[in-house]
């Protein structure tokens, strides 16, 4: 039976256990994801308490990380989502995304509405991908793809 969380506490505690096991076993999120049939971004979000995993994926992940039956079951619960608490984020990496939306948020909104009409980009019917590519000027660049279904506003 599908279960749901009413607070973030249990999933946050499990995330701490998961991250310790990941470090202890020297695993990457990509390695943990292998065999689940899901994307690295989705599994990572689930491990950080933002999505439930299907039973088969939870078992694969749990086996790799050495989670007990309760941990594997908890990975399958629907979490109370939202990982950034307390307003403006203080972590530098997360803050840069916040900053990008502060600078480009209204631009994104204007372009989405101009190209699609009044509506939103779904974060439910959604795909996320992060790639590291070489920068022709030296170093590396991050290519982050946000791929969400457009949902038009419907008058009622």
Curated annotation (Swiss-Prot):
Superkingdom, natural source: Bacteria
UniProt feature coiled coil, ranges: none
Q: What is its EC number?
A: 4.2.1.104
Q: Which GO terms describe its molecular function?
A: cyanate hydratase activity; DNA binding
Question: GO biological process: what's one of them?
Answer: cyanate metabolic process
What Gene3D superfamilies has UniProt attached to this entry? Answer: Cyanate lyase, C-terminal domain, lambda repressor-like DNA-binding domains
- Recorded catalytic activity of this chain's protein: cyanate + hydrogencarbonate + 3 H(+) = NH4(+) + 2 CO2
**Which Pfam families does this chain map to?**
Cyanate_lyase, CYNS_N
Cross-referenced SUPFAM superfamilies, in alphabetical order? Cyanase C-terminal domain, lambda repressor-like DNA-binding domains
Under the heading InterPro entries, the entry gives: Cyanase (IPR008076), Cyanate_lyase_C (IPR003712), Cyanate_lyase_C_sf (IPR036581), CYNS_N (IPR048564), Lambda_DNA-bd_dom_sf (IPR010982)
First-level EC class:
lyase
Catalytic-site annotation from UniProt: 96, 99, 122
Q: Which key words tag this protein in UniProt?
A: Lyase
> What does the function comment of this entry state?
Catalyzes the reaction of cyanate with bicarbonate to produce ammonia and carbon dioxide.
Query: Which family does the record claim for this protein?
Result: Belongs to the cyanase family.
Q: Which PANTHER family match?
A: CYANATE HYDRATASE
Which NCBIfam families does the record associate with it?
cynS, PRK02866.1
Protein name, per record: Cyanate hydratase
Gene name of the encoded protein: cynS
């Amino acid at each position: 039976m599908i279960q749901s969380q009413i607070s973030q506490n249990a999933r946050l505690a499990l995330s701490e256990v998961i991250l310790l096991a990941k470090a202890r076993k020297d695993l990457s999120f990509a390695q943990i994801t292998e065999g689940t049939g899901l994307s690295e971004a989705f599994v990572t979000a689930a491990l950080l308490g933002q999505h439930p995993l299907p039973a088969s994926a939870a078992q694969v992940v749990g086996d790799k990380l050495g989670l007990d039956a309760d941990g594997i079951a908890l990975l399958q619960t629907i979490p109370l989502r939202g990982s950034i608490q307390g307003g403006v984020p203080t972590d530098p990496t997360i803050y840069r995304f916040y900053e990008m939306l502060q600078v480009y948020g209204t631009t994104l909104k204007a372009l989405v509405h101009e190209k699609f009409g009044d509506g939103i980009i779904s974060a439910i019917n959604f795909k996320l991908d992060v790639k590291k590519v070489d920068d022709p000027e030296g170093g590396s660049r991050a290519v982050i793809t946000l791929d969400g279904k457009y949902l038009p506003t419907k008058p009622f």
